[in-house]
Amino acid sequence: MLKSRKFWAYEPCQAFELKEELFDNYKMKGKFNEDVQYFYDIIGIAPHPCFKLKQYKLDPQKEPVELQSIEIINSKIDINTLKIIFYMLPSTKIYNMKFISNDWDINNLEYLINSLLERPNNIYYLSYEWNDKLSINGTNVSINSEEGKTDYADYFNKEKNLIYKLIKNSKLEGLCLRGDLLGDEAAIRIFELLEKNNTIKTLSLYNNNLTPKCFPAFCHMLLFNRKLEDINLGKNFFDDECIANLKDNLGKTAMSQEDVVEYNKKVKERDAIIKANAKLKQQKKPENEVPFLYEMMMIQDQNYLVKNKDLKIINLMLNPLTDKCYDSIINIFDNCPDMFITIDNKVLSEEHKNSFFDKKSKYFDKIYFSK
């Protein structure tokens, strides 16, 4: 036990070892603040500020508002605070965790991700924002610095692998990676993993140094992902050509009669595989892979191949777009009537902007112009 300290501090709390048997042998009192205080008393230090963010009273006559979110902003997180958080989580209604500008120790970050995946919790929304620096040997190193790209590259590669692991295995519905400067290669891997992800509905990759290099992977992901509804790609380097390519991977595409014949042929082939797999399953033999087919639907005697109709919101603000993207945006709205897009106020000409302000237009209120 440390000499009692009035205020929480990272170094002494990080250096102390809260052993697992302390948690195993403790019988919770059912009062959040008292249970948290017990472990910090053992350390001999005040609780981390994150435990007080939402513990306020709206009315002196009423009970404190129950904690539903853990938010750690502009503060480091020691290993013992993480242990206490995950010990307390199953007995709370906390569903949201926000970690913003924390200068993580990579081992602490690994503990966080592994605990999210392996320990009981009800976390469905995670923000890991503006964390472009890691604390390495007592020094904060940026992912974009020369040292971050050379001497300490392994640390940042481990950080990225932890993010991939989270996307691949967790039950998260919302993930915010804003301002982490992850880069194209990381984004490509994230999009690849999202092809098979069936939980994440909202994703922010705002300000991640993304260029047109990773955009084909984003478009390809849209062909397979059927869960993502809202993506923030703001403050990157996507251009007009990216938007032109995007329209081919959203909504519906008209089919010719030949297309319909070919599609029906593939449906029969797929159904035959499914039928054969049922027998293989009974025989406990390996099943064959079932080919993926898009949905076909008919609208007013015209058949359409339906691609991604689930994505509803795209934020493209602070990207180097020009008025040339107008036709592509219109095509996206034609293919996806429920789509909503955000771009900068200065991207489109006044004439083109006005087309979205006409209440009689089908494009009215489909776009937000950020200032």
Model-predicted regions and their roles:
Residues 1-371:
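Leucine-rich tandem repeat or coiled-coil scaffolds
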